[in-house]
Amino acid sequence: MRYFRIIVTKGDDSKLSKLNISTTVSGDIIVTHLIGKIKTDDVYEWFNGFEQVCQQFISEGRKYKLLVDRKGYTPDHFSVQKAWKDKFFNETILNHSKAIAFLLEEGEILNYLQQSNTKESVKFFDDYEQTLVWLNGYPI
């Protein structure tokens, strides 16, 4: 008699987004990506680039809008999310931003954030084009 072992896994690693921890500028919008299977070291590397771009605006006395793309963000460990929060919620960086748009995966977390958000200058989206339309229309 033969036995077969069936292993059921959740998710499919082959569908994980490729690592992207870049930050770019388009006019007065800073676009930062934190996508893929993210480790704590990736957060630190991402923040170094992100902070440099923000500091350029700050040193010139310019305000900016942020597009934070975390669509496809998968933390490698629970400590990754804490590291991201500790780095991103930086008083200097946030005080110089006029608007922040978060691009996230569609689902319960996005729905919760959209429904519970009370700040006019912060919005949550699952569509890149809608995110850009809102940011471009937001006054600086």
Give the role of each language-model region.
Residues 2-140:
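Amphipathic, Lys/Arg-enriched alpha-helical "gate/interface" segment within cytosolic domains
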